[in-house]
């Protein structure tokens, strides 16, 4: 099943750092233009990267990752987002690792139908990783039910392989170094971050503000990156 890739390109606007915040979802307002960043993950812990940027009634999510590791962290994947998925207007992915992309199938199941912008390599990797993640979620639930290791009746997967396959149709590839408009009045520019194939840093510009999301960085000279 090949998702209908679409590339968007538009013109645009100009400086501000993202400040480190605590482990819980926290907000930071930047001046009268009220650009609001809510840290939903990747803060206080490495995994679960989700950064909700809000302005003038529009909401854009940078990364959509799963919490991984200890049980207390994994349980956070079952908590609803503070904003209904259907009210998020666009998603940008820095790269395909599940702690940055693995929540997408759940977003789809919760009603998100907007575009998910990522490099072509990230889209291709997500087409492998997300269905595999859904399959493993189903396998884990089946194992718990088969051996009676669950307090729930029955244990359910966080999402299914089918959910993951459906979510792939939201992916829209973008190119490095080519600014585009993920939403009216917003500009995003992806640049190479090394790390893995397709990994990007994302410069987001809105309301005269510039916010750089580095994503995961490193190893830009590995042969596989070239």
Where do the protein language model's features map onto the residues?
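N-terminal metal-binding scaffold of metallo-dependent hydrolase/deaminase domains
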Residues: 33-48
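Pre-active-site segment of Zn-dependent metallo-hydrolases
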Residues: 43-45, 55-114, 118-171, 217-226
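Catalytic core of the metallo-beta-lactamase
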Residues: 36, 40, 54-55, 174-226
């Amino acid at each position: 099943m090949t998702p209908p890739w679409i590339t968007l390109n538009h013109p645009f606007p100009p400086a501000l750092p993202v400040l480190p915040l605590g482990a819980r979802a926290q907000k930071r307002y930047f001046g009268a233009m009220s650009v609001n960043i809510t840290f939903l993950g990747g803060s206080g812990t490495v995994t679960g990267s989700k950064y909700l940027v809000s302005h003038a009634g529009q909401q854009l999510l940078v990364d959509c990752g799963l919490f991984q590791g200890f049980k207390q962290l994994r349980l956070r994947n079952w908590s609803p987002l503070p904003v209904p998925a259907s009210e998020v207007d666009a998603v940008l992915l820095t790269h395909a690792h599940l702690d940055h992309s693995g929540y997408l199938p759940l977003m789809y199941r919760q009603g998100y139908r907007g575009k998910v912008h990522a490099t072509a390599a990230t889209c291709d990797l997500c087409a492998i990783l997300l269905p595999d993640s859904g399959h493993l979620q189903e396998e884990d639930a089946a194992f718990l039910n088969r051996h009676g290791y669950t307090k729930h009746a029955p244990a359910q997967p966080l999402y299914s392989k089918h959910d993951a396959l459906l979510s792939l149709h939201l992916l829209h590839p973008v190119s490095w170094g080519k600014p585009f408009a993920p939403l009216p009045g917003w500009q995003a520019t992806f640049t190479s971050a090394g790390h893995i194939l397709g990994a990007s840093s994302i410069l987001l510009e809105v309301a005269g503000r510039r916010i750089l999301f580095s994503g995961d960085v490193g190893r830009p000279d590995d042969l596989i990156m070239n």
